[in-house]
């Protein structure tokens, strides 16, 4: 979310099982200095129970964290990132707002990795090999890890932090976690910035299942793409794929890797999915300056892509070339790639840089069932693959996880809404929910308008893509995001003061 993989894409693709390396630990607390870009931190591990909710065993694992106390002063706040579906490095690099706040707030900066992602593997190399292991991968288990982590930092790791305020930060699925962290553990977390968090995107949340592609299409059309150009492109690909000469033309035009050459007319499906995935991902990271979160991209990449599709192509070849220019901008803007590997069963997806390709699919095959599909014209400019059904999705889950003894009863479409709330969060407090109008995941956000309800704030960034406000300050930032970050900063300061006032009261 956060950074999420489209469920429609998952239905059409499979991924290879990746076994991750064990973290190298020394006495259970391996640590060393690291830096990513301009951000510096200590990497370490703390011991966490594999099952914090049961009292049947004492099994533990090494949970990874990043810590920076360069600007921390005794009693200062702890800015706590709730790690989401990927290795921790990517989120530390792309959550500059926390790093920017640390000097002003005299704060410690903490990132804690989500269990089963990155180096936080409860069963080391066996974590993904059996449902008896992978079954411990869930949002509620991760939240318990975070709660334990706060106690570790306050009591053992950060000097004088026993009464420090804790402010949770997260984007996408991490934003959902930061909000739920505050809701589930209000005695531990004093406030949360939940950016681009689709907290109401569950089976029973009553959001349109095709809203993601509706927003993707809106973003591209608003940026200058011609709807007919895109739709003619799909038709052109289908027609060209029917002949040997047409497939050869597409193999050359798209510079397809030998692993993903078009060999028959049905192969066009994976090429179309490859293009669609790039467009859906590009809409998420449509920032006003060059970035490399999911892929190296120029400023306002959707606008740049639409320069190639401002008018319908006059021939099938021209229409196919328009889509090629869009997909090549996403996957190869730097020009470093000589070929495109488009078959997702054999190649990385648009989200490959996040790592752990099977972790999030497993969560969507158990607790995080999020209906998502395209319905075609007039909703979007993709092809129709709606309706989303649990039965159809269960087939994907069985295909992907049957080798580790998964069965269809583990797909629980109502689990997420039951655990956290499918349509409302009545116990929420001290949370800022920020969503971007340009971000497809805003369709399942807390609200679609600016609103204040008690101490819960909803804010919409009209020029905002996926958790834009969490990124660090940049010379090309919009004035809008500067104002939103200023508002969020004031909210955080208010929560810190409330914590100090309440701590004094009970001294």
Swiss-Prot record:
Signal peptide boundaries: 1-16
EC number: 3.4.-.-
UniProt xrefs under Pfam families: Peptidase_S28
InterPro entries membership: AB_hydrolase_fold (IPR029058), Peptidase_S28 (IPR008758), Ser_carbopepase_S28_SKS (IPR042269)
Glycoprotein as UniProt keyword: yes
Protease recorded as keyword: yes
Enzyme class, first EC level, given as a word: hydrolase
Annotated GO biological process: proteolysis
GO molecular function: dipeptidyl-peptidase activity; serine-type exopeptidase activity
Disulfides per UniProt: none
The entry's keywords: Glycoprotein, Hydrolase, Protease, Serine protease, Signal
Catalytic-site annotation from UniProt: 172 (charge relay system), 439 (charge relay system), 466 (charge relay system)
Residues bearing glycans: 125, 332, 407
Domain of life: Eukaryota
Family statement: Belongs to the peptidase S28 family.
Protein name: Prolyl carboxy peptidase like protein 5
